[in-house]
Amino acid sequence: MSYMNTTWEKVCDSLQKRLSPGTFKVWIAPLVASEHDGQLFLYAPSLFVMNWIQERLFVDITEAVSEVSGGTMKVQIEVKSSVPDKPQVSLTDYNNKQHIPYNGFPNTKVSISRSHISSQTEQLPLPVSLVKAPFSSRSWRYSFDSFVVGPCNNLAHAAAQNMIKDTASVDTLFLSSGPGLGKTHLTQAVGQALCNISNRANPKVEYLTAEEFCSCFVQSLRTKNVDSFKGRFRDTDLFLLEDIHFLQGKEKMQDELLATIRSLQGRGSRVVLTSSFAPKELKNVDNRLVSRFCSGFLAGIEKPNAETRRRILIEKAKVHAVVLSEAVADFLAMKLVGDIRQLESSISNLVLKAKLLDCMISMDMAKDVIAQYTQDDPFMNIDSIIHAVSGSFGLQAEKLYSRSRKQDFVVARNTIFYLARKHTDMSLQEIGDRFHRRHSTVLKGIASIEREIQRKSPTGRQIANTLNLLERTNIHLN
């Protein structure tokens, strides 16, 4: 038995202890592994599987590999379209040894259009550290080709495409919207497009969140390497920064970002910024910085209408290499009226259920999946949100209006702020008035919820699960 076989088998042993049997069978079993130059390469059967593992299982995989290799082996995942001629091992031998009869997806009857399966290997290194490395043209997840344009986002889409033109009318774009409506998609699409059309072999592109920007700056201060930090972000062709609202109240970081944007605009570079809030809604942000935000083009993104949702569902199904019938697409579009992440999640669950049951996607199956997301009796207002959140947290709704700073009350209130902002037409001021809080308190609370979810901390995962449960079972989004 080779070292590679031993390594992968040990990793699988560890993963079986960490993951549920169903998760291991569906996502880990189809992988093929090989080792080269001290790295473990994992080959997924499709782009969908690779992206799913990248988003949900990479922490478990990297921890298991680190445990087995003593922290010496790095991990990369690719689509199995051109596996190199290296010693490989799939779960076939491993499962035979362990007497596990299942070693991949069942032969499914789901309609598949092979023209939608990527023919190129897309390699994505599984991140280990907090700070992202600069993106290359091969590591962008989203592109303009996969963005569905509708009345809700056509202006933002046109503005984003304008950013990659030589004749761009502005050099700064500020995108704002509620969570899950396409800000990240458009931001990455700008980066991907610039990398593809640039006449330079390696255009300088920086893509990160405002929190990661802060972490980089703090690290440069600790290592006394501020000049390197400034050189990295001020000498770039395209600067993509998400979640600007994280910088509220952080004066030093605002000064650094202001200097960075000034430098970039001075050298003719392009800047794309995103936030859950429009510049005028930001609090405790330097007026000079807000002025810089407003000096470019401001574009908001709204919730998609039924027709746009239908087209998004069809497009997301193509990512899974599945052809969705018009009837099922229309049904889902009418029932799922939340954000785009909800549409993605429903399609993922629908496809996975069809594969696990080895059957075609039918209207009955769609209705079963929809039942996890909506109720037959729709209701949506601040009162229903307060009722649902207080019940989920085991708190009396009346006490949420108090001035208590106990952690449970703070998290529950912030969750209400987040849901009200995301799923109602209430302004930040109106939400604050309901709880006798200031506009800035509501904004800060929403930002804290988003930050914990993005960090995927224990608290963040708990909040995300609570939000998911509430949105599926207690609230009909409209």
Swiss-Prot record:
Gene Ontology annotations for the cellular component aspect, listed alphabetically: cytoplasm; plasma membrane
Pfam families in alphabetical order: Bac_DnaA, Bac_DnaA_C, DnaA_N
GO molecular function, one term: ATP binding
Cellular localization per UniProt: Cytoplasm
UniProt record, GO biological process: DNA replication initiation; regulation of DNA replication
UniProt region (Domain II), positions on chain: 72-136
Region spans: Domain IV, binds dsDNA: 355-478
Spans annotated as Domain III, AAA+ region: 137-354
SUPFAM superfamilies, A to Z: P-loop containing nucleoside triphosphate hydrolases (SSF52540), TrpR-like (SSF48295)
SMART domains per record: Bac_DnaA_C
Annotated keywords: ATP-binding, Cytoplasm, DNA replication, DNA-binding, Lipid-binding, Nucleotide-binding
Region annotation (Domain I, interacts with DnaA modulators) ranges: 1-72
Binding site for ATP: G180, G182, K183, T184
Description of how the protein assembles with itself and partners: Oligomerizes as a right-handed, spiral filament on DNA at oriC.
HAMAP family (UniProt xref): DnaA_bact (MF_00377)
Record note on domains: Domain I is involved in oligomerization and binding regulators, domain II is flexibile and of varying length in different bacteria, domain III forms the AAA+ region, while domain IV binds dsDNA.
Family the entry assigns: Belongs to the DnaA family.
Function field: Plays an essential role in the initiation and regulation of chromosomal replication. ATP-DnaA binds to the origin of replication (oriC) to initiate formation of the DNA replication initiation complex once per cell cycle. Binds the DnaA box (a 9 base pair repeat at the origin) and separates the double-stranded (ds)DNA. Forms a right-handed helical filament on oriC DNA; dsDNA binds to the exterior of the filament while single-stranded (ss)DNA is stabiized in the filament's interior.
Protein name: Chromosomal replication initiator protein DnaA
Organism: Lawsonia intracellularis (strain PHE/MN1-00)
Originating gene: dnaA
